[in-house]
């Protein structure tokens, strides 16, 4: 009984965080679209690409860094090149960044494509907030992952 209650509470908390993440994602949807498909040539898709990032060693950290510090420079996603700027969302609380990352990792099925996916936590975000990177340095982190 206690285990069932504990599982219910934990899953309920994750569902609440995802609901908050969906609300926060509304700030992202103007560029990346509500369905995560992006706008070809202008704003890269998140759906499908988040799983590719999460599968890489260091991918979780990279996603957090993108939200904290932004991203600037040319990238390639699904064979299409994008050369723009993603603004920082450092004004969000650590819990909010974790929530929106959990949303983009689960909303379009990407988490199911990554073996052993674990939800992002505010503690992970807090730890990386101390790094103080530029958007260009975040781009360099992307390249270290082997992503274009």
Swiss-Prot record:
Pfam family, one: Cytochrom_C
Ligase keyword on record: no
Signal peptide bounds: 1-17
Annotated binding of heme c, by residue: 28, 31-32, 86
InterPro entries: Cyt_c-like_dom (IPR009056), Cyt_c-like_dom_sf (IPR036909), Cytochrome_c-type_DH (IPR051459)
Gene3D superfamilies referenced in this protein's UniProt entry, alphabetically: Cytochrome c-like domain
Tree of life domain: Bacteria
Transmembrane annotation, as ranges: none
Keyword entries, A-Z: Electron transport, Heme, Iron, Metal-binding, Pyrrolidone carboxylic acid, Signal, Transport
GO molecular function, one term: heme binding
PTM annotation (Pyrrolidone carboxylic acid): residues: 18
Description of post-translational modifications: Binds 1 heme c group covalently per subunit.
Keyword Nucleotide-binding: no
Stated role: This monoheme basic protein appears to function as an electron donor to cytochrome oxidase in T.thermophilus.
Protein's recorded name: Cytochrome c-552
UniProt organism field: Thermus thermophilus (strain ATCC 27634 / DSM 579 / HB8)
Taxonomic lineage from the root: Bacteria, Thermotogati, Deinococcota, Deinococci, Thermales
């Amino acid at each position: 009984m206690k285990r069932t209650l504990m599982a219910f509470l934990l899953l309920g908390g994750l569902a609440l965080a995802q609901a908050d993440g969906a609300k926060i994602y509304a700030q992202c949807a103007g560029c990346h679209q509500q369905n995560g498909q992006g706008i070809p040539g202008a704003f890269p898709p998140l759906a499908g690409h988040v799983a590719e990032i999460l599968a890489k060693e260091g991918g979780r950290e990279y996603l957090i860094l993108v939200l904290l510090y932004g991203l600037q420079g040319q990238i390639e996603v699904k064979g299409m090149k994008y050369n723009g700027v993603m603004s920082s969302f450092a004004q969000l609380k650590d819990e909010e960044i974790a929530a929106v990352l959990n949303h983009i990792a689960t909303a379009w099925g990407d988490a199911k494509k990554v073996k052993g996916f674990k939800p992002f936590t505010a503690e992970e975000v807090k730890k990386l907030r101390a790094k103080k990177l530029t958007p260009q340095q975040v781009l360099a982190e992307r390249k270290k992952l082997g992503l274009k």
